[in-house]
């Protein structure tokens, strides 16, 4: 598989739609945006924004930035606009922040950089405003922690309209679907109606409590991706860099710590389920069955990820080492 084929596969897996350059989505109407911001329709409906459209260029920038951080969280800002109930992300840029394995903190340097970048963007004709922030959760899924919820609530108070995006670079498989989630928080005191459960995702045992406490304070947006013919050269340039890194690395070796952590986490979950089984009450048995079911799904997902990594290594071995060519 060459670079072009891999790029097309990536675009198909993530359902990236190609739009004509003259499409309305690429035009920025300053007056229209000002009217929307003045009207503030999101204040009347906490669930006002339902969808988010992300350009393929912004998507690849965010994924590459998140991947470069390794096991440390990274953070960046997104530029775009709003249209009806949809938020549109046109571009994204990284911020110089201090990241750890569990949180990311923006300091004065990051705010100065942010201001300078926004001013420079306007000088070259990019009039879009900041419409959200993104950060990474290396290896533990796309959701908002307690700190993330507080940060997003603050942003929605003073910088509306604003969205939070979470990228998991470890779970994002080469030439596969990007592990990404977009969220908005509810106002304080608001009780959301019972919603359908979102797509299941593996949450490490040491993160489950943080996830469970705050999961009702925000809601996910439906995500779609788009690109234009004008994006092609920029996307090609970024993809070539990404593709070389992909060929030169192994998911099995790069994610060794993540895989080991997953196995240890599964072991703890199974042990916890076993403890509930011995208590005898119907409530505990039901809870244990639920925990066992989730542990089984986590185990299946981990196995599939390992098989994909092994298959990728076999394909690269056949392509570049020419195993069996002389037979």
Swiss-Prot record:
SMART domains per the UniProt record, alphabetical: JAB_MPN (SM00232)
Alphabetical UniProt keywords: Cytoplasm, Developmental protein, Differentiation, Hydrolase, Metal-binding, Metalloprotease, Nucleus, Oogenesis, Phosphoprotein, Protease, Signalosome, Zinc
Motif annotated as JAMM motif, chain positions: 135-148
Major localisation: cytoplasm
Required co-factors: a divalent metal cation
Tissue expression remark: Expressed in the optic lobe neuropil.
Any single Pfam family the record assigns to this protein: JAB
Outcome when changing residue 137 to A: Abolishes ability to deneddylate cul1
Sequence ranges assigned to domain MPN in this UniProt record: 52-189
PTM sites of type Phosphothreonine: 303
Subcellular location: Cytoplasm; Nucleus
Enzyme's top EC category: hydrolase
GO MF: deNEDDylase activity; metal ion binding; metal-dependent deNEDDylase activity; metallopeptidase activity
Residues where Zn(2+) binds: 135, 137, 148
Record-listed Phosphoserine modification sites: 300, 302
Cellular component terms per the entry's GO annotation: COP9 signalosome; cytoplasm; nuclear periphery
Result when mutating residue 160 to V: In csn5-1; disrupts R cell projections
Any Gene Ontology biological process: negative regulation of proteasomal ubiquitin-dependent protein catabolic process
Family annotation (CDD domains): MPN_RPN11_CSN5
EC number: 3.4.-.-
Role according to the record: Probable protease subunit of the COP9 signalosome complex (CSN), a complex involved in various cellular and developmental processes. The CSN complex is an essential regulator of the ubiquitin (Ubl) conjugation pathway by mediating the deneddylation of the cullin subunits of the SCF-type E3 ligase complexes, leading to decrease the Ubl ligase activity of SCF. In the complex, it probably acts as the catalytic center that mediates the cleavage of Nedd8 from cullins. It however has no metalloprotease activity by itself and requires the other subunits of the CSN complex.
PANTHER family, alphabetized: EUKARYOTIC TRANSLATION INITIATION FACTOR 3 -RELATED
Swiss-Prot/TrEMBL domain comment: The JAMM motif is essential for the protease activity of the CSN complex resulting in deneddylation of cullins. It constitutes the catalytic center of the complex.
Family per similarity comment: Belongs to the peptidase M67A family. CSN5 subfamily.
Subunit details: Component of the CSN complex, probably composed of CSN1b, alien/CSN2, CSN3, CSN4, CSN5, CSN6, CSN7 and CSN8. Interacts directly with CSN2. Also exists as monomeric form. Interacts via its MPN domain with Trc8.
Protein name according to UniProt: COP9 signalosome complex subunit 5
Source organism: Drosophila melanogaster
């Amino acid at each position: 598989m060459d670079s072009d084929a891999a790029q097309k596969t990536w675009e198909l897996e993530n359902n990236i739609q190609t739009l004509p350059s003259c499409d309305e989505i690429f035009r920025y109407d300053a007056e229209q945006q000002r009217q929307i911001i003045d009207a503030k329709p999101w204040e009347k409906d906490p669930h006002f924004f339902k969808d988010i459209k992300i350009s393929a260029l912004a998507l690849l920038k965010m994924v590459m930035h998140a991947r470069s951080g390794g096991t440390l969280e990274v953070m960046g800002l997104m530029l775009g606009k709003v249209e009806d109930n949809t938020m549109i992300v046109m571009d994204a840029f990284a911020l110089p922040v201090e990241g750890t394995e569990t949180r990311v903190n923006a300091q004065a340097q990051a705010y100065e950089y942010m201001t300078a970048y926004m001013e420079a963007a306007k000088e070259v004709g990019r009039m879009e405003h900041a419409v959200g922030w993104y950060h990474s959760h290396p290896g533990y899924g796309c959701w908002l922690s307690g700190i993330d919820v507080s940060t997003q609530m603050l942003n929605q108070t003073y910088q509306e309209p604003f969205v939070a995006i979470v990228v998991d670079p470890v779970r994002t498989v080469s030439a596969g679907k990007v592990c990404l989630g977009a969220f908005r928080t509810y106002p304080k005191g608001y009780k959301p109606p019972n919603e359908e459960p979102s797509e299941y995702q593996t949450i490490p045992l040491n993160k489950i409590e943080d996830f469970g406490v705050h999961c009702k304070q925000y809601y996910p947006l439906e995500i779609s991706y788009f690109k234009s013919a004008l994006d092609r050269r920029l996307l090609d340039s970024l993809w070539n860099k990404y593709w070389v890194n992909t060929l030169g690395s192994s998911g099995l070796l790069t994610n060794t710590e993540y895989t080991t952590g997953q196995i240890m986490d599964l072991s703890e979950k199974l042990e916890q389920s076993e403890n509930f089984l011995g208590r005898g009450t119907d409530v505990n048995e039901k809870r244990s069955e639920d925990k066992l079911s989730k542990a089984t799904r986590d185990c299946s997902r981990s196995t599939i990820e390992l098989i994909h990594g092994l298959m990728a290594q076999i394909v690269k071995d056949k392509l570049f080492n020419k195993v069996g060519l002389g037979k």
